[in-house]
């Protein structure tokens, strides 16, 4: 009886092992298989009111998707500029949306302490639709800008070599141009302490195939800023005329802006203070005035720009382009100075000089 039970137990164990081995073989065979090709068709919808754009201008590399470019680029739309606007800091507030860009605490668009990746960057380095030397150090109007492209890092291949080009990166202003759908926007805004601005943005395309387009942006502003004792008033006009067909693109941009700025804040200079004698430490924050400049300090400018460009397709994979521009600037009023720290109490001196041809 015991022999029969032992034989039955051995047979049961062998059958279980065989079944397990067979099941394992079957499982291994099912782990590897190949599906037939699957094609997925879809259409990307264009969103409106976005903060960033999908495309950017890349100089010699042409235009392209920002996700496919060999450089670090972020392309901000005019929505970013609108939502970042503060009097005298519109451009700076928008630029610092990029984590590679830093701005000094007392900077304004006129008095810039800008850095890209820790390296100093001047507003003279800003490109206008890929052309250097068209932007001056001033309170930058942003109402005519359709995209603001910021490239961080080496950029000579993309931007070319400007007279004062920074190795840290560059900023490119892309002007608005007429779109397929006509637009007319009239805006009035109030900000800070009695600071008013009024603007118009009109664009339309013409021709049998809408090959011609015109975009007009104009703005006037006047009032006090958030800085104590500072006020400014100015106006601007930018007109962009373009032509586009299957083989070519051409455009001509005219820009004019002028501004009078009284009491523009300056940064307190501590580097040249008499350290170790009259100055031994930084003064307490509450002992320093909010604005070192008097209300009658003056900084006024007039800025004109003319920009012509043409792009021609010579073949499926070959395109040539040419761009040329002229910029004229004038400072009819310049009465300002840098404040120098004198002692631990926060006293400072100003040696104001300059001239004015304004009436």
Go through the PLM ranges and name each one.
Residues 2-3, 11-13, 120, 132, ...:
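Short, flexible loop/turn elements at secondary-structure junctions
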Residues 52-60, 164-165, 267-271, 276-280, ...:
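Short, flexible, mixed-charge acidic loops at enzyme active sites
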Residues 129, 154, 182-185, 220-224, ...:
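Extracytoplasmic loops and strand-loop junctions of Gram-negative outer membrane beta-barrel proteins
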Residues 39-53, 259, 325, 329-339:
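Short, solvent-exposed beta-strand-terminating loops
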Residues 183-185, 190-287, 295-320, 324:
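Transmembrane beta-barrel wall of Gram-negative outer-membrane proteins
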Residues 1-31:
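Cleavable N-terminal targeting peptides that direct proteins into the secretory/outer-membrane pathway or into
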Residues 33-181:
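Acidic, small-polar-rich N-terminal luminal/periplasmic segments of exported/outer-membrane proteins
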């Amino acid at each position: 009886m015991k022999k029969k039970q032992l034989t039955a137990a051995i047979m049961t164990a062998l059958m279980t092992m065989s079944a397990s081995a067979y099941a394992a073989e079957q499982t291994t065979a099912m782990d590897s298989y190949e599906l037939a090709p699957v094609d997925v068709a879809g259409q990307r919808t264009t969103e409106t009111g976005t903060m960033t754009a999908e495309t950017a201008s890349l100089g010699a590399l042409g235009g392209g998707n920002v996700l496919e470019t060999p450089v670090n680029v972020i392309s901000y739309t005019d929505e970013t500029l609108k939502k970042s606007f503060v009097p005298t800091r519109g451009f700076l507030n928008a630029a610092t949306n990029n984590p590679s860009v830093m701005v000094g605490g007392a900077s304004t668009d006129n008095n810039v302490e800008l850095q890209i990746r820790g390296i100093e960057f001047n507003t003279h380095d800003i490109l206008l639709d890929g052309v250097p030397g068209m932007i001056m150090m001033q309170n930058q109007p942003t109402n005519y800008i359709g995209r603001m492209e910021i490239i961080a890092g080496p950029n000579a291949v993309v931007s070319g070599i400007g007279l004062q080009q920074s190795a840290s990166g560059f900023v490119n202003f892309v002007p608005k141009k007429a779109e397929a759908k006509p637009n007319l926007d009239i805006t009035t805004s109030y900000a800070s302490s009695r600071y008013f601005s009024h603007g118009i943005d009109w664009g339309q395309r013409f021709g049998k195939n809408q090959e011609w387009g015109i975009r007009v942006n104009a703005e006037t502003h006047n009032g006090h800023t958030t800085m104590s004792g500072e006020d400014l008033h100015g106006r601007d006009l930018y007109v962009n005329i373009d032509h586009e067909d299957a083989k070519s693109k051409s455009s001509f941009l005219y820009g004019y802006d002028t501004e009078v700025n009284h009491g523009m804040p300056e940064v307190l200079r501590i580097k040249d203070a008499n350290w170790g004698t009259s100055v031994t430490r930084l003064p307490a924050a509450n002992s320093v005035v909010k604005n070192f400049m008097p209300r009658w300090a003056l900084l006024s400018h007039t800025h004109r720009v003319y920009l012509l460009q043409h792009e021609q397709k010579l073949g499926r994979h070959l395109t040539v382009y040419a761009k040329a521009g002229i910029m004229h600037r004038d400072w009819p009023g310049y009465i300002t100075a840098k404040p120098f720290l004198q002692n631990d109490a926060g006293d400072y001196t100003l040696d104001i000089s300059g001239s004015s041809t304004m009436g």
